[in-house]
Curated annotation (Swiss-Prot):
<comment type="function">
    <text>Cell wall formation. Catalyzes the addition of glutamate to the nucleotide precursor UDP-N-acetylmuramoyl-L-alanine (UMA).</text>
</comment>
<dbReference type="GO" id="GO:0051301">
    <property type="term" value="P:cell division"/>
</dbReference>
<keyword id="KW-0067">ATP-binding</keyword>
<dbReference type="InterPro" id="IPR013221">
    <property type="entry name" value="Mur_ligase_cen"/>
</dbReference>
<protein>
    <recommendedName>
        <fullName>UDP-N-acetylmuramoylalanine--D-glutamate ligase</fullName>
        <ecNumber>6.3.2.9</ecNumber>
    </recommendedName>
</protein>
<keyword id="KW-0133">Cell shape</keyword>
<dbReference type="InterPro" id="IPR005762">
    <property type="entry name" value="MurD"/>
</dbReference>
<dbReference type="Pfam" id="PF02875">
    <property type="entry name" value="Mur_ligase_C"/>
</dbReference>
<keyword id="KW-0132">Cell division</keyword>
<comment type="pathway">
    <text>Cell wall biogenesis; peptidoglycan biosynthesis.</text>
</comment>
<keyword id="KW-0961">Cell wall biogenesis/degradation</keyword>
<keyword id="KW-0963">Cytoplasm</keyword>
<dbReference type="InterPro" id="IPR004101">
    <property type="entry name" value="Mur_ligase_C"/>
</dbReference>
<keyword id="KW-0547">Nucleotide-binding</keyword>
<feature type="binding site">
    <location>
        <begin position="118"/>
        <end position="124"/>
    </location>
    <ligand>
        <name>ATP</name>
    </ligand>
</feature>
<dbReference type="GO" id="GO:0005524">
    <property type="term" value="F:ATP binding"/>
</dbReference>
<dbReference type="GO" id="GO:0005737">
    <property type="term" value="C:cytoplasm"/>
</dbReference>
Amino acid sequence: MRYLSEIKNKQITVLGLGVTGLGIVRFLVSQGLTPTVVDSRINPPGIDWLKQNTPTLTTRFGDLDSADLCASDMIIISPGLSLTIPAIAKAINAGVEVIGDVELFARINTKPVVAVTGSNGKSTVVTLAQQVLLAAGYKAALGGNIGTAVLDLLQSDLSNNDVDVYVLELSSFQLDTTTSLQPISATVLNVSEDHLDRYASYQAYIDSKLSIYNNAALVITNADDEATHSKAKSQLSFGANQGDYSLGEYQQQTYFMQANKAFLPVTSLAVVGKHNYLNALAVMALLSPFNISKAQYSTAFSQFNGLAHRCQFVAERAGVKYFNDSKATNVGATIAAIDSLATNGQQLIVIAGGDAKGADLNALTPYLQQHVKALICFGKDAKDLMALTNKSHLTNNMSEAVTLAKQLSEPGNIVLLAPACASIDMYNNYMQRGDDFIQCVMAEQP
């Protein structure tokens, strides 16, 4: 709280009035601060809340160049805004401090933080980690890039002392404006090409992810993904066949292994698939600083049913199973989904497409050749996907794609929506895309 006193008389600008920006404003106002609110949009999403609750705050909506950001002592920026935007870059060059909501949280918070980033699996890992902590009796708050904004969580804790530990999902965009976070444990789950429309290079994206390790008491790396590795002195690893936490055989069953000793059978986890087992191993490594029993893990694992749009089972029709992995917005996620569902030699019919955001799609090719019976494509970069295999088909929309998938399938096949692309060319978000897939599947006659 002392930090808030230190900045009370500073000229603070909140830049961006979406969900995150509104959370920043709410928090600052609740602590007696009066920020200026700036957004490039004339009517940003949070404008009605401002008018009703903080009508006296100074606001500047419209052209950022006219907002005079250089007059600020500090800018607290929403993660959706790039630091390379000319007006923002000008302020940075003028010496204005630019931070994000996670950085403000880190400067005030005194409770332990478990921090998770990665190209894929973040939401599943943090949700499962919270459930394990709750089963062990900890008051665990989940937020960041999922659910509740970090400053809303912090405000609740400052008022009610209702948090023992924070479990935070953090995007690379959030990490770019965060330097003070000191997690009790932190991981980069995996890295695959994504957001290359925002970063100058793939390495710049990797470096952004790896910054989560800075100041972490314990670093958790993926033994199977060299891009996640660290030179930190205090670290553990997880992996399919290697690492401190891994998968192994014991008494003719596959087990979660801890230091090569059988811990729990993978059947203790309610969701199936290699990617889910790896997520569980990551959780075990992340939570190693906490006192959690095998029974408490078993309880949480058995009650975890996964998240919507993440390899979500939709239906079985005429012996064909349909899975919705609309959250697979990059190549790595689609590979993980194919690899997980094709474990018993099933032939997959994959529906993919959307905006690839400049990513290299070629890593998909061996998986398409080995496990995929047909690749059905639509969306902005459909033709780039089609070039990967001679088993590809072009459609105009989700309805056509699902209908064609039904025609091409036979009993024992799996139809998988795993787009390998963002949804923004045709949908508001990946959830809307996944819901469209589900509706199309359910509309097909069995």
